[in-house]
Amino acid sequence: MSSKSHRKRPLMHIQTYFRALISIAVSAGTLYLAAAILPGLYIEDPLRAFVAAIAISVANALLWPLVIRFALPVAVLTLGLAGFVINAALIWVVVNLIEGMDVTAYWVALVVAFMITLTNTIVMSLLGIDDDDFYYRNVIRRQARKHADASLSEAVPGILFLEIDGLAEPVMRRAIRDGNVPELARWLRSGSHRLEGWECDWSSQTSASQSGILHGSNEDIPAFRWFEKETGTFVVSNHPGGAAEIERRHSDGRGLLAGGGASRGNLVTGDAEHTSFTISALHARPTRGKDYYAYFANPYTVFRTFILSMLDIGRELYAAAQQIRRDVVPRVHRGIRYSLLRAVTVVILRDIAVQTVIADAYAGRPVVYSTFVGYDEVAHHSGIERYDALDVLRGIDQAFGRITHAAETADRPYRVVVLSDHGQSQGATFLSKYGTTLQELVHGACEAAVMENPFGSDEAWGQLSAAVSELVIRKGFVLERITQGHESGDAIVLGPGHELASGEGVEGVRELIKVLASGSLGLIYLDAEPGRRTLEQINATFPHLIPRLVKHKGIGFILVLSEQDGPLAIGAHGVHHLETGRIEGIDPLLPFGPNAARHVLRTSGFAHVADIMVNASFDEQTCEIGAFEELVGSHGGLGGEQMHPFVLFPSEFPWPEEPVVSAEHLHRVLVGWLHDLGHDIARVKHLERLQEEAATS
């Protein structure tokens, strides 16, 4: 046990008892007040209210874990409402068993349950008592210690990698300046941490970035979703089968999290031994559901989840209405279904991630990587620096504070690293700005059948699929009905296009031209014949297609392969010969940064690169880019802040003098930090191999 942890232990016990006494007193006072204002609730005197408060606390402690074990799926799918309803029934029974008290109707018990939760939350907040912190430091500590190693205090320090999905370095710096991330700002101002930017690959999205960061390779990941001609299948990154295939192709067994690490809420595992809510591992986990059970085992968590979910839905509906009322542009449609999806990512998945990371720290995992997806989801639909997106960012910042404070009391010492996998760029969508989709543009130029985009644009469906899949180990009647037709092996796949992503119905679209969108990046597959169609073949078959694409104002450049000149980046006013560097006319890659040619040339060598890769145009004056999907904030291609994620890390860690360009490069940096802390020899050999490969590439 670390000396710091040992010194804090007596204070924590005092805080625990104090918090329990305050909670019982507040509950008793609320019960007595409720009896005065609610018809149907009778309490003879304050003493009986105090007895009832103690009885309710004891009943929750003894009965709730058993109840929630059976009611878990319904509690999760109703955002905590079902658990709230069950606890009201518990209150109804307990109060009616005490002499001198009476509840005449269930609805009265429901109101009382709400009042007790609300007053406890308000009073604890006013007294500066963090209920979350109390729960994380006490309940989770006891659970995790059962599996912890007694020698952890002498172990090498571990690292907690906390990813904020989709947050660009410039946005992060402005958030620090403007007070939107006070916890992270405090780290920087104290000198304990420093902030650096890095540049991701052309495919500036999670599967390419996380595969590179966690496994050290993102070769042949051209976009978030792509088509493989030789097998006639679609690979969709947030589909369990697609994510598992990505990991199979890139894992060598010695990823960033190998050797006892934990992967929480990621797309790939990084070869972690412990996983939850990790899309590539959904088919393989025999213990799915235990993290949900741990989260909902505390009735306070259920009430809090329900209240926070309702508040988040309300905030979303209000923010969407305000954008319409004020005619804020750019904007996209945001309906009730999205508000429910947002509540899952912003509230439930965030808080479960906090709980599991803290449990990992108390269990002494050597390295943990967890993704927090809430900001990315809201920024897609609202905008990268709109107030509701920044509000979600503040919530993530608070969550990181809880993790850090809890980690300080863990037996193993920990270093905390906060990073992002890519940024986002903002702008009016291609459709809203030009009145047509990329699919329609290709259809008009080719005068041939084009497959309609079946996949939708919301990445959060993958996270929701992971969330529901974690429940299927406890599948019952309700889940059977809800998930019918969405099974993919042992996992559940929700959202548009799940059939094609699972390999069903592919024959029906095999011969169609396929136009796929990945934010500001488009992929055009002109046929299903294996191999890439060349510029000369395209011009012979579809003579109007290339001219129509490059002359469109919404398209910055296209990538094609010429039989004579090799890979070419072609824009409206010039051509960039990628192998030789020769420029004809105006370089179409000029607005996309000094490393654009390097990124595009590398992608051109991928086995599954599309016949035509299309990058949206970037306005250097307004820093705007138009997505080929209906997203205000987007990523996936070149242009603007989507290419510039960040790393916030302990000042004692070294940072390369040269720019960090590519997720694979960042992987080498992170592995180097583990090496410097003294992690296992296999990782050291892995780092040496990576450095040799980088030097010869």
Identify the function of each model-found stretch.
Residues 2-111, 121-131:
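Juxtamembrane/disordered regions of integral membrane proteins
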Residues 132-192, 432-433:
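Active-site-proximal N-terminal segment of extracellular/periplasmic enzymes that hydrolyze or transfer
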Residues 134, 216-383, 519-526, 531-532, ...:
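His/Asp/Glu-rich, glycine-adjacent segments
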Residues 153-173, 213, 367-373, 393-396, ...:
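Beta-strand elements within well-structured catalytic alpha/beta cores of enzymes
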Residues 174-211, 216-220:
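Short, structured active-site-proximal loop/turn typified by the sulfatase FGly-forming signature C/S-X-P-X-R
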Residues 231, 238-252, 260, 264-271, ...:
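Active-site neighborhoods of enzymes that stabilize oxyanions during catalysis
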Residues 347-348, 375-416, 440-450, 543-544:
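A long, amphipathic alpha-helix that forms part
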Residues 397-435, 567-570, 575:
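Metal-dependent active-site segment of extracytoplasmic phospho-/sulfohydrolases and closely related
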